[in-house]
């Protein structure tokens, strides 16, 4: 910030400056495909609500303990027959804890008004001692904040839709409570969220 302020001041004073040296270059690549699917039975805004069971805080005694594992499914239909497998990429966002690779949990109850709930989670108080973890069905953590290849989210095969030259897919994952490394788990209602994108081969 100081360097930028200095350069601006020098330009206003009419001092000629040489172009600044670069330390490196970041090359960003990507691919957009026209092979798309439709999410089955979405709620407004494609919001999927996962209700974790009510558990005792004694189930989360030690750092890394996971409890209340709950499966959730994302169903896709009308996919091209050329698509063999699909998986999800969980997008980084305000709820991402880049240290633990889990989702921050907030002391706020879920309610029907999703637009209000998702407006600004950090404006509410973060829960102590506990976060929410996303996992594959084998229980292995899907690390939040990582690149898509490094999340290692499981991919699933599709099935042909009856009477149509299209496929359907059901993607299965787990969510659960996880004990943080520090702080006692407090008894409270919790809410978090994460955006996702479907990854096409």
Swiss-Prot record:
- Cleavable signal peptide: 1-21
Q: Does the record bear Cell membrane in its keywords? A: no
Q: Where in the cell is it found?
A: Fimbrium
**Gene Ontology biological process terms, A to Z:** cell adhesion involved in single-species biofilm formation
Q: Does the keyword Disulfide bond apply?
A: yes
Q: Which InterPro entries match?
A: Adhesion_dom_fimbrial_sf, Adhesion_dom_sf, Bact_Fimbrial_Adh_Pro, FimA-like
Keywords assigned: Disulfide bond, Fimbrium, Signal
Give the UniProt entry's GO cellular component terms: pilus
Show the disulfide pairing: 37-79
Q: Which family does it belong to?
A: Belongs to the fimbrial protein family.
Name the PANTHER family on file. FIMBRIAL SUBUNIT ELFA, FIMBRIAL SUBUNIT ELFA-RELATED
What this chain does, per the record? Bordetella pertussis is the causative agent of whooping cough. An essential step in the disease process is the attachment of the bacteria to the ciliated epithelium of the respiratory tract, enabling the organism to resist normal host-clearance mechanisms. It is unclear which bacterial cell surface component are responsible for adherence but the fimbriae of B.pertussis are prime candidates for being involved in this process.
Q: What is this protein called?
A: Fimbrial protein FimX
Q: Which gene encodes it?
A: fimX
